[in-house]
Structure formats: structure tokens, C-alpha cells
Amino acid sequence: MSERGGAFSCGAELTALPDGVRRVADVLQQSGHPHTPVMLADAVRTAQQAADALGIAPGQIAKSIIFRRQSDDAAVLVITSGDRRVDEKKVDALVGTTGRADAAFVKARTGFSIGGVSPVAHAQPPVTLIDRELFRFDEIWAAAGHPQGVFKLRPQDLERLTGAPVADVVEHTAS
């Protein structure tokens, strides 16, 4: 692997990667996405940690947050900017009443552990919403199926890869 700052490029060593990262890499390759996942030197569990490791603003981290829809037990994925908090009332208005998803639900539905949930390559396709705040940036980074795995993309790529609508799903502070 070749080192790039705090990250290591995966390149041709895809078979040596964790299963989740390989799944994400396969989806990215099949879709013609120009970037492959990279493995960070250390696991990152927060948007701030990921941003620090990559040398970018926290808002450039695309956080993948899973909720559990109450009516049918479906997984609801909200992909939001790392410097924003999801407004659950806005999400509920768009997809129906949701609740928090525990680690077992997240792993069963996505195939990923919390801290490594990717916006793509889920075990079962979730209902997905994309935070419009991500479009403030030309370049963003998302988890690639492992707490150390990330990949680079544009917000428009996220929209194309997921087929999800872009919506106002975050809390706004009074100015």
C-alpha cells in the first residue's frame, strides 16, 4: 500500500482488505467511480477524527446514520454532513416514524459495524436520504465498510451511487 498523509491507498491489494471494504470497492469499481477506498492508519469513530486524519473540514465527512422505521422495521440510512446533526422529525416526515437502531440491527441490515457504515454495498438496500448540506463541498469522504476505510467522492457521485433523494434532514440553529 502507498501512504498518503494519514491514509494508505488500497490499489491492487483489494484481496487483503477487510470484507466490508472489498464490498464497497467492488461497488465503486462496477459503477465506474474513479476513486478506490483507502485505509487510514488508525480507526476513526467520529466525523472529527476522520476529518483530522484526512486533513479536511468535518463537514466534508459524509456520516452514514441508520435508523429503524417502526411501521415495517426497514433500515433508513441518512447520509449527513459531519458537522451537522440529523433532525429526526424531518426524517420521520419524509419516511415515516423512525427510532434509533442498535448495533445488532445495523450489522444485520447493512453488513457493516457502527463506525464503518458505508453509503453503498449494504447487505439489504435501505431507504436512503442525502443531506443537502453535503453539497456545500466539492469533495467529500465517506466510510468504506470499516472504521479505518474511507473513500473520496463528490456529493453528486453520492446521489448517483445511491439513487437517493437530497433533502433537508438536519437541525438548523437560530441565527
Task: Report residues per predicted region.
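Extended, low-hydrophobicity, polar/charged segments
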Residues: 1-175
